[in-house]
């Protein structure tokens, strides 16, 4: 644990940029502590008697499971509200919905499209709001990524993290800014047409001038400690599939790329789901249409000793638990 525990009670968790390096590192320390307590069967009911609304405008496996189990472990009561249960901006404004939910719940998670929606929930509900994913940021994922990197690399400061693929999506944005805040050497490797927005690059450079944005794979992956990728087409962008496949094929994470790092201990991360084989209906469909058995990562890399993707998935739960405990729980 950090020597000084920051007071985060009542804060919302919307994006990494809202927190200091010390606060982000505190979340990681607390997550590691709670992970150890769960492993050893030590109760940690910091949210005893609290009620938490889980709003899912976008479907999810890991985020929903992580928040649900985290709530239960912390002693809270989770209530799932899917897109058919909520009327955000349709029959009821986000502001009005926020005010109603804030009267009934002690905390609110939101996973959806517009970042403005989660900001409005935070502004109007009067309770902590946690961003489970928006089109702009994915901060709970980044906390899990940072915890996984610290567990396997041993530190975060000056660690070389290379994100390869669609450089404009929420995962890339959060890794770029979140990684820079904690002192990592973050590199985004993607075709120029998919480079992050300049405002995101500028924000990251405020924390770390070492930020690299490049289309050159060899330059990016040299001496990397971490290679990270994500799906080539995000939810809601399916019409861009053929174009993305052609654009990103040279950026597939394969064993050649792993070897080009020159680091035998390099780790591979992916926020999942990953399209590394044809064992899904989606994978079969892609194979029939495009002749691809693997997309953003090869099956060889995904199943190799370098891959830490399931540790990473588990860490979603521990880091989400830390965020909820720190912002809503009684930590005294």
UniProtKB/Swiss-Prot annotation:
GO molecular function: amino acid binding; ornithine carbamoyltransferase activity
Top-rank taxon, per record: Bacteria
Binding site residues for carbamoyl phosphate: 60-63, 87, 111, 138-141, 271-272, 316
GO annotation, biological process: arginine biosynthetic process via ornithine; arginine catabolic process to ornithine; citrulline biosynthetic process; L-arginine biosynthetic process
Disulphide-bridged cysteine pairs: none
Binding site for L-ornithine: 170, 230, 234-235
InterPro entries reported in the protein's UniProt record: Asp/Orn_carbamoyltranf_P-bd (IPR006132), Asp/Orn_carbamoylTrfase (IPR006130), Asp/Orn_carbamoylTrfase_sf (IPR036901), Asp_carbamoyltransf_Asp/Orn-bd (IPR006131), Orn/put_carbamltrans (IPR002292), OTCase_ArgI (IPR024904)
Catalyses which reaction(s): carbamoyl phosphate + L-ornithine = L-citrulline + phosphate + H(+)
E.C. numbers: 2.1.3.3
Pfam family, one: OTCace
Location, primary (coarse class): cytoplasm
GO CC terms, sorted: cytoplasm
Keywords: Arginine metabolism, Cytoplasm, Transferase
Associated pathway: Amino-acid degradation; L-arginine degradation via ADI pathway; carbamoyl phosphate from L-arginine: step 2/2
Location(s), subcellular: Cytoplasm
Function (record text): Reversibly catalyzes the transfer of the carbamoyl group from carbamoyl phosphate (CP) to the N(epsilon) atom of ornithine (ORN) to produce L-citrulline.
Family of this protein: Belongs to the aspartate/ornithine carbamoyltransferase superfamily. OTCase family.
Protein's name according to its UniProt entry: Ornithine carbamoyltransferase, catabolic
